[in-house]
Amino acid sequence: MSVLDTGIDISHPAFTGVDIVRKNFTTESDDDEHGHGTHCAGTIFGRDVAGIRIGVAPGISKVLIGKVLGSGGGGSDQIVQAIQWAVNEGANVISMSLGIDFPGYVKELETDGFPTELATSMALEGYRANVLLFERLASFIAAQNAFIQAALLIAAAGNESQRDVDPKFEIAVSPPAVADGVLSVAAVGKTPQGFTVASFSNVGARVSGPGVGINSAKLGGGLTLMSGTSMATPHVAGVAALWAQKLSVTGQLNGQLLADRLVGTAATTGMKAGFDPGDIGAGVVQAPQA
């Protein structure tokens, strides 16, 4: 298992007994200074905290933590380097709760003085370049799966939609999740009428996971609630780890088969009536039966 994010608080009780291998791809300290990565890691493999279960796959004994996001975000080069490192180190699941905010990038360029048309064109060119970059990388990893341990890339769909403002205000999945070969993840939340897509969750993801009000490890100790497709992604990564363990017993483990299991067993049971399949993909991922 590998988590590429803001790092991890290795002193948190949720990670007691876990063999954590860290590599820093930023210019900042090795430690998590934000809490985002710590929270995501807790959802994947965190041990119980004060009697509360937070980890989907708490039996994971070794993880690779790549710090690719700092105070100013992160770049594609660092993410690519981290993915290559994780693959070379034998990760079979790589969880990435990160992405490119296309509308936000356009606004940033406009703030820098670029006309709207030029800012949009520049952002689109960057978007396309990133999609192609991650598709080439995913294709390379898929080709390697026949020779080395499998690796499945899982990434957050993004949080730019605003269905709470307008039900039609839906933004498409952002890079790297939109790239072919990457399993994109949408977020769902619980309502009295059943589960529903989170208002912020981008549209067009392949699968979904819980992503609203998620309780997990807090930077410095304890637990805290967070929401986002960033929180849904580690749920899917944790379930992927459980499937990887099951498939490895029969010697069938490879990235494509792992993705097929996650998509093929995903379910829409419990979803609020009238849900749009485009919002949640195949449905919420399901752990394998014992």
What is each PLM-predicted segment?
Residues D19-T27, A217-G222:
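Glycine/charged-rich beta-loop-alpha catalytic/anionic-binding loops adjacent to active sites
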Residues M1-V21, E28-D77, Q84, E89-N92, ...:
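Subtilisin-like serine protease catalytic core
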Residues T43-I44, G66-L69, Q84, G211-I280:
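Hydrolase catalytic cores
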Residues T26, L64, L152-I154, S184-V185, ...:
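Structural detector of well-ordered beta-strand residues that form the stable sheet scaffold
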Residues M1-G7, P13, D164-V249:
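Extracellular S/T/G-rich loop segment that most often corresponds to the catalytic His/Ser-adjacent loop
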Residues M1-V3, K23-D32, E135-S139, A143, ...:
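N-terminal domain-start motif of subtilase-like serine proteases
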Residues V68-P175, L219-T233, G274-D276:
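Substrate-binding/access-modulating region of protease and related hydrolase catalytic domains
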Residues G99, G158, A187-K190, A266:
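Flexible loop residues that form catalytic
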